[in-house]
Amino acid sequence: MKSRLEIKYKDQIVPELFKELNYKSIMQVPKIQKIVINMGIGDATTDPKKLDAAIFELEKLSGQKPIVTKAKKSLAVFKLREGMAIGAKVTLRGKKMYDFLDKLINVALPRVRDFRGVSKTSFDGFGNFTTGIKEQIIFPEVDYDKVIRLRGMDITIVTSAKTNKEAFALLQKIGMPFEK
């Protein structure tokens, strides 16, 4: 069964973007390819239990098992050695991607205190959008009473758009709340 957002994309957004951006083929219309959620846990070098808690929370909100990210280089300033676990990330595609994006736009972001919209300047020049979230408790799956420490995360939405303008138009039609 398809996600509500996926149905909206195929039936409504694709024809609108096709006309709006003057494409010659329907295959040129940009689409979301994947969403990458990254949680960096700096405390994981001293206490591995903090990494386990972050992995559990990331698994709850994404619906799939995250992979542990490891340090590429040793840094004495942070007491970090090459190969030490320092975070977790998960890559979402398909139905889980659309479900997560729907939840992010309609449930999680409106729960952020003093939320005025996500930044319009968070595009990378190649049609990808990255935003940071300061607290994981804005997601309904994360139980506030079981949270040991508030952690932020980076959410990257990778699109097939060639330019920032195309990616902005796509995300705006999907319902991403951009700041005015």
UniProtKB/Swiss-Prot annotation:
PROSITE patterns: RIBOSOMAL_L5. Gene3D superfamilies: 3.30.1440.10. SUPFAM superfamilies: RL5-like (SSF55282). The keyword Cell wall biogenesis/degradation does not apply. InterPro entries: Ribosomal_uL5, Ribosomal_uL5_bac-type, Ribosomal_uL5_C, Ribosomal_uL5_CS, Ribosomal_uL5_dom_sf, Ribosomal_uL5_N. The keyword Ribosomal protein applies. Keywords: Ribonucleoprotein, Ribosomal protein, RNA-binding, rRNA-binding, tRNA-binding. GO terms for molecular function: rRNA binding; structural constituent of ribosome; tRNA binding. One of its GO terms (biological process) is translation. GO terms for cellular component: ribonucleoprotein complex; ribosome. Part of the 50S ribosomal subunit; part of the 5S rRNA/L5/L18/L25 subcomplex. Contacts the 5S rRNA and the P site tRNA. Forms a bridge to the 30S subunit in the 70S ribosome. Belongs to the universal ribosomal protein uL5 family. This is one of the proteins that bind and probably mediate the attachment of the 5S RNA into the large ribosomal subunit, where it forms part of the central protuberance. In the 70S ribosome it contacts protein S13 of the 30S subunit (bridge B1b), connecting the 2 subunits; this bridge is implicated in subunit movement. Contacts the P site tRNA; the 5S rRNA and some of its associated proteins might help stabilize positioning of ribosome-bound tRNAs. HAMAP family: Ribosomal_uL5_B. This is Large ribosomal subunit protein uL5. It comes from Mycoplasma capricolum subsp. capricolum (strain California kid / ATCC 27343 / NCTC 10154).
